[in-house]
Amino acid sequence: MLSLVGLGPGRGYVTEAAAEAIKNADCVFYEDYTAPLDVEALRRLARGEPIRLTRADLEDHSGRKIFECLKEGKRAVLVTGGDPMLATAHAAILALARRRGYRVEVVPGVSIICAAFSLSCLSIYKLGGVATVTYPRGGVYSTRPYDLVEQNLQRGLHTLLLLDVREDGRFMPPREGAEVLLQLEERVGRGLFKEDLPIVVVYKVGWGGSAVYATLGEIARSDLEGPAVFIVPSRLGPVEKECLEGLSARSSTR
């Protein structure tokens, strides 16, 4: 049997269901390239030393190490930060296991999407979609964040922007994410990602971070650390507006 288990976005988010699945497993695998993971908590729960899987292990080799464990009739778990099913690589492993006739269970965890909207007090019903702010590849910037934010602002919807992760596991800090958006504005030039654009930054959830509300220019000059996500708010209801004013006031006292 294979269990895909989410540990939540940081320390203190492990559910009872997640803990039980890990304790009962013969083989415990984890990856930390899609989201940060509380490895020490994982070690306390596992019966043996957890095995770290790389992006290549999961995506290029289709989780071969996991299936070697399953072939021996053992219980395997793949543990991730956040929720296990928000990454396409994890969904691919689940689908492959089912095709090969193995029982599969999913143990949900607190996702960064839910955490971001909880901490910002914005309505998740107005989420218009998710895009990733990526580092340029070969000098080319992805315009997907620009296009999605532009569409959502026209429709009165909020946009969640995930921030990139380098191959070495380094999470893009908010300052670099803001700089990428400003560079996109220089290239696209439709007046969207200006320095005065208001943005919510949710950073280091479960690792001593919180949420701040500031302008894109202020974020580009900040020293906030990753991992982080941005929310570009659109039309605000009265409660949303009051919540963001509170975040802005708290941010100004830092």
Curated annotation (Swiss-Prot):
It holds the Pfam family TP_methylase. Keywords: Methyltransferase, S-adenosyl-L-methionine, Transferase. Its EC number is 2.1.1.98. S-adenosyl-L-methionine binds at D83, L86, S111, I112, L163, V205. Signal peptide: none annotated. One of its GO terms (biological process) is methylation. It catalyses: 2-[(3S)-amino-3-carboxypropyl]-L-histidyl-[translation elongation factor 2] + 3 S-adenosyl-L-methionine = diphthine-[translation elongation factor 2] + 3 S-adenosyl-L-homocysteine + 3 H(+). One of its GO terms (molecular function) is diphthine synthase activity. Pathway: Protein modification; peptidyl-diphthamide biosynthesis. Homodimer. S-adenosyl-L-methionine-dependent methyltransferase that catalyzes the trimethylation of the amino group of the modified target histidine residue in translation elongation factor 2 (EF-2), to form an intermediate called diphthine. The three successive methylation reactions represent the second step of diphthamide biosynthesis. Belongs to the diphthine synthase family. This is Diphthine synthase.
